[in-house]
Protein backbone atom coordinates (compact mmCIF):
# COMPACT_ATOMS: atom_id res chain seq x y z
CA UNK A 1 0.00 0.00 0.00
CA UNK A 2 1.07 3.60 -0.55
CA UNK A 3 2.64 5.46 2.37
CA UNK A 4 0.58 8.41 3.55
CA UNK A 5 2.03 11.84 2.84
CA UNK A 6 1.97 12.76 6.51
CA UNK A 7 3.88 9.58 7.51
CA UNK A 8 6.99 10.38 5.46
CA UNK A 9 9.95 11.96 7.25
CA UNK A 10 11.37 15.00 5.47
CA UNK A 11 15.00 16.18 5.79
CA UNK A 12 16.63 19.32 4.38
CA UNK A 13 15.77 20.55 0.88
CA UNK A 14 17.45 19.27 -2.27
CA UNK A 15 19.76 21.85 -3.81
CA UNK A 16 18.45 23.68 -6.84
CA UNK A 17 19.50 22.00 -10.05
CA UNK A 18 17.00 23.42 -12.55
CA UNK A 19 14.89 26.47 -13.22
CA UNK A 20 11.14 25.82 -13.38
CA UNK A 21 8.04 28.00 -13.48
CA UNK A 22 4.28 27.85 -13.04
CA UNK A 23 3.83 25.67 -16.11
CA UNK A 24 4.40 22.83 -13.62
CA UNK A 25 1.43 24.07 -11.58
CA UNK A 26 -0.71 24.26 -14.72
CA UNK A 27 0.23 20.64 -15.46
CA UNK A 28 -0.66 19.50 -11.94
CA UNK A 29 -3.97 21.33 -12.08
CA UNK A 30 -4.89 19.62 -15.35
CA UNK A 31 -4.15 16.01 -14.36
CA UNK A 32 -4.52 15.89 -10.56
CA UNK A 33 -8.28 15.13 -10.58
CA UNK A 34 -7.41 11.69 -11.93
CA UNK A 35 -5.02 10.68 -9.14
CA UNK A 36 -6.51 9.08 -6.01
CA UNK A 37 -5.05 9.47 -2.51
CA UNK A 38 -4.58 6.09 -0.86
CA UNK A 39 -4.92 4.04 -4.04
CA UNK A 40 -3.48 0.53 -3.79
CA UNK A 41 -0.95 1.16 -6.57
CA UNK A 42 1.42 4.13 -6.61
CA UNK A 43 0.75 5.06 -10.23
CA UNK A 44 -2.91 5.62 -9.34
CA UNK A 45 -2.05 7.78 -6.30
CA UNK A 46 0.50 10.04 -7.96
CA UNK A 47 1.45 12.29 -10.83
CA UNK A 48 4.20 11.23 -13.21
CA UNK A 49 6.30 14.37 -13.70
CA UNK A 50 8.84 13.94 -16.47
CA UNK A 51 10.67 15.77 -19.22
CA UNK A 52 8.08 17.76 -21.15
CA UNK A 53 4.90 16.49 -19.53
CA UNK A 54 2.90 15.36 -16.49
CA UNK A 55 0.64 12.29 -16.51
CA UNK A 56 -2.04 10.90 -14.18
CA UNK A 57 -4.66 8.16 -14.33
CA UNK A 58 -7.44 6.69 -12.21
CA UNK A 59 -7.39 3.38 -14.07
CA UNK A 60 -10.17 4.40 -16.46
CA UNK A 61 -9.00 7.79 -17.74
CA UNK A 62 -5.46 8.94 -18.45
CA UNK A 63 -4.39 12.51 -19.22
CA UNK A 64 -1.03 13.97 -20.26
CA UNK A 65 -0.27 17.70 -20.07
CA UNK A 66 2.74 19.24 -21.83
CA UNK A 67 4.65 21.73 -19.66
CA UNK A 68 7.78 21.82 -21.84
CA UNK A 69 10.36 21.75 -19.01
CA UNK A 70 13.25 19.26 -18.98
CA UNK A 71 13.00 17.20 -15.77
CA UNK A 72 13.93 13.66 -14.69
CA UNK A 73 11.02 11.21 -14.40
CA UNK A 74 9.51 11.06 -10.92
CA UNK A 75 6.32 9.82 -9.29
CA UNK A 76 4.99 12.58 -7.01
CA UNK A 77 2.30 11.74 -4.40
CA UNK A 78 -0.95 13.54 -5.11
CA UNK A 79 -0.89 15.23 -1.69
CA UNK A 80 2.47 16.82 -2.50
CA UNK A 81 1.24 18.18 -5.81
CA UNK A 82 -1.85 19.57 -4.08
CA UNK A 83 0.36 21.32 -1.51
CA UNK A 84 2.43 22.93 -4.29
CA UNK A 85 -0.74 24.27 -5.89
CA UNK A 86 -2.12 25.56 -2.59
CA UNK A 87 1.11 27.41 -1.73
CA UNK A 88 -0.07 30.29 -3.90
CA UNK A 89 3.47 31.38 -4.83
CA UNK A 90 5.33 31.28 -8.13
CA UNK A 91 7.66 28.35 -8.72
CA UNK A 92 11.26 29.25 -9.58
CA UNK A 93 13.51 26.27 -8.92
CA UNK A 94 13.75 22.51 -8.61
CA UNK A 95 16.01 20.12 -6.69
CA UNK A 96 16.25 16.34 -7.01
CA UNK A 97 18.00 13.47 -5.24
CA UNK A 98 16.43 10.39 -6.87
CA UNK A 99 14.24 9.54 -3.88
CA UNK A 100 13.04 13.09 -3.21
CA UNK A 101 12.32 16.35 -5.00
CA UNK A 102 12.19 19.94 -3.81
CA UNK A 103 10.09 22.67 -5.39
CA UNK A 104 11.40 26.17 -4.70
CA UNK A 105 9.24 29.30 -4.71
CA UNK A 106 9.98 32.93 -5.50
CA UNK A 107 10.49 33.84 -1.82
CA UNK A 108 13.04 30.99 -1.30
CA UNK A 109 10.53 28.88 0.59
CA UNK A 110 10.17 25.31 -0.62
CA UNK A 111 8.17 22.10 -0.51
CA UNK A 112 10.14 18.87 -0.38
CA UNK A 113 8.50 15.53 -1.09
CA UNK A 114 9.54 11.91 -1.05
CA UNK A 115 8.93 10.15 -4.36
CA UNK A 116 7.32 6.79 -4.98
CA UNK A 117 9.89 4.20 -6.06
CA UNK A 118 7.50 2.35 -8.36
CA UNK A 119 7.66 2.82 -12.12
CA UNK A 120 4.73 4.35 -13.96
CA UNK A 121 3.48 1.82 -16.55
CA UNK A 122 4.16 2.39 -20.24
CA UNK A 123 1.11 4.40 -21.26
CA UNK A 124 2.15 5.38 -24.78
CA UNK A 125 0.42 2.40 -26.49
CA UNK A 126 -2.91 3.64 -25.09
CA UNK A 127 -2.79 6.51 -27.57
CA UNK A 128 -2.41 4.27 -30.63
CA UNK A 129 -5.43 4.81 -32.86
CA UNK A 130 -5.68 4.04 -36.54
CA UNK A 131 -7.45 6.80 -38.43
CA UNK A 132 -7.41 9.27 -35.54
CA UNK A 133 -9.60 12.23 -36.55
CA UNK A 134 -10.60 14.42 -33.57
CA UNK A 135 -13.41 16.93 -34.04
CA UNK A 136 -14.80 19.71 -31.83
CA UNK A 137 -16.99 18.48 -29.00
CA UNK A 138 -20.64 19.47 -29.64
CA UNK A 139 -21.54 22.66 -27.79
CA UNK A 140 -24.29 21.03 -25.72
CA UNK A 141 -22.39 17.80 -24.98
CA UNK A 142 -21.52 18.37 -21.32
CA UNK A 143 -24.85 20.02 -20.60
CA UNK A 144 -26.38 16.81 -21.90
CA UNK A 145 -24.05 14.63 -19.82
CA UNK A 146 -25.06 16.47 -16.64
CA UNK A 147 -28.72 16.29 -17.53
CA UNK A 148 -28.65 12.57 -18.27
CA UNK A 149 -26.39 11.65 -15.33
CA UNK A 150 -29.08 12.70 -12.86
CA UNK A 151 -31.47 10.12 -14.36
CA UNK A 152 -28.97 7.28 -14.82
CA UNK A 153 -29.11 4.57 -12.15
CA UNK A 154 -25.74 3.20 -13.29
CA UNK A 155 -24.00 6.54 -13.79
CA UNK A 156 -23.52 5.72 -17.48
CA UNK A 157 -24.52 7.81 -20.48
CA UNK A 158 -25.20 5.90 -23.69
CA UNK A 159 -25.01 7.05 -27.31
CA UNK A 160 -28.24 5.89 -28.96
CA UNK A 161 -29.94 7.07 -32.17
CA UNK A 162 -28.32 10.51 -32.20
CA UNK A 163 -29.02 11.05 -28.51
CA UNK A 164 -27.41 10.72 -25.09
CA UNK A 165 -29.50 8.30 -23.05
CA UNK A 166 -29.62 7.22 -19.41
CA UNK A 167 -30.53 3.63 -20.24
CA UNK A 168 -29.71 1.16 -23.00
CA UNK A 169 -33.44 0.69 -23.56
CA UNK A 170 -34.55 3.92 -25.23
CA UNK A 171 -38.20 3.46 -24.24
CA UNK A 172 -37.16 3.53 -20.56
CA UNK A 173 -34.51 6.24 -20.84
CA UNK A 174 -34.19 9.96 -20.38
CA UNK A 175 -32.59 11.34 -23.54
CA UNK A 176 -30.88 14.48 -24.86
CA UNK A 177 -30.45 14.98 -28.59
CA UNK A 178 -26.82 15.45 -29.72
CA UNK A 179 -25.94 15.01 -33.39
CA UNK A 180 -22.80 13.29 -34.63
CA UNK A 181 -22.11 10.79 -31.83
CA UNK A 182 -21.13 7.20 -32.70
CA UNK A 183 -23.86 4.65 -32.18
CA UNK A 184 -23.71 2.22 -29.29
CA UNK A 185 -20.91 3.52 -27.03
CA UNK A 186 -21.34 4.20 -23.31
CA UNK A 187 -19.23 6.19 -20.83
CA UNK A 188 -19.13 6.81 -17.11
CA UNK A 189 -20.55 10.32 -16.71
CA UNK A 190 -18.37 11.04 -13.68
CA UNK A 191 -15.20 10.37 -15.68
CA UNK A 192 -16.38 12.51 -18.58
CA UNK A 193 -17.01 15.42 -16.21
CA UNK A 194 -13.60 14.96 -14.58
CA UNK A 195 -11.86 15.83 -17.84
CA UNK A 196 -14.35 18.40 -19.14
CA UNK A 197 -11.79 21.28 -19.16
CA UNK A 198 -9.52 19.21 -21.45
CA UNK A 199 -12.28 17.67 -23.58
CA UNK A 200 -12.28 20.22 -26.42
CA UNK A 201 -11.74 17.92 -29.40
CA UNK A 202 -12.50 14.23 -29.41
CA UNK A 203 -12.30 11.07 -31.48
CA UNK A 204 -14.72 8.35 -30.34
CA UNK A 205 -13.15 5.09 -31.54
CA UNK A 206 -15.57 2.19 -31.64
CA UNK A 207 -12.95 -0.40 -32.62
CA UNK A 208 -10.83 0.17 -29.49
CA UNK A 209 -13.81 1.20 -27.33
CA UNK A 210 -12.08 4.43 -26.26
CA UNK A 211 -12.42 8.16 -26.67
CA UNK A 212 -9.29 10.18 -27.44
CA UNK A 213 -9.60 13.77 -26.28
CA UNK A 214 -7.51 16.90 -26.70
CA UNK A 215 -7.38 20.36 -25.14
CA UNK A 216 -4.89 23.16 -24.67
CA UNK A 217 -1.51 21.43 -24.07
CA UNK A 218 -3.27 18.23 -23.06
CA UNK A 219 -4.31 14.88 -24.51
CA UNK A 220 -6.09 11.97 -22.91
CA UNK A 221 -7.85 8.67 -23.35
CA UNK A 222 -11.06 7.48 -21.70
CA UNK A 223 -12.22 3.87 -21.77
CA UNK A 224 -15.84 3.23 -22.70
CA UNK A 225 -17.81 0.57 -20.85
CA UNK A 226 -17.92 -2.95 -22.25
CA UNK A 227 -21.47 -3.28 -23.53
CA UNK A 228 -20.84 -6.88 -24.60
CA UNK A 229 -20.18 -8.01 -21.04
CA UNK A 230 -22.74 -10.38 -19.54
CA UNK A 231 -22.27 -8.66 -16.16
CA UNK A 232 -24.34 -5.51 -15.65
CA UNK A 233 -22.25 -2.39 -15.12
CA UNK A 234 -21.85 -1.51 -11.45
CA UNK A 235 -20.46 2.00 -10.93
CA UNK A 236 -19.37 1.38 -7.32
CA UNK A 237 -17.56 -1.87 -8.14
CA UNK A 238 -15.80 -0.29 -11.09
CA UNK A 239 -14.52 2.59 -8.93
CA UNK A 240 -11.91 0.16 -7.59
CA UNK A 241 -11.01 -1.41 -10.92
CA UNK A 242 -7.42 -0.39 -11.65
CA UNK A 243 -6.95 -2.64 -14.69
CA UNK A 244 -6.69 0.20 -17.18
CA UNK A 245 -4.99 -1.46 -20.17
CA UNK A 246 -2.12 -2.14 -20.13
CA UNK A 247 -1.89 -1.27 -16.44
Spans of model-derived segments:
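DNA polymerase processivity clamps
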Residues: 1-247
Amino acid sequence: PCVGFGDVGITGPDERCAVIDDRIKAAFEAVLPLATDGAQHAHLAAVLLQSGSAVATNGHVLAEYWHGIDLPPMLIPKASAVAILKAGKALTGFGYSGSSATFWFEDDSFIKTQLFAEQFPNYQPLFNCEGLNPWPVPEEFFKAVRSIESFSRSGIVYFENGMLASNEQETEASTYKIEGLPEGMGFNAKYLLMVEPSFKNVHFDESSNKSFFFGENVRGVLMAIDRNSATPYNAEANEEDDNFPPF
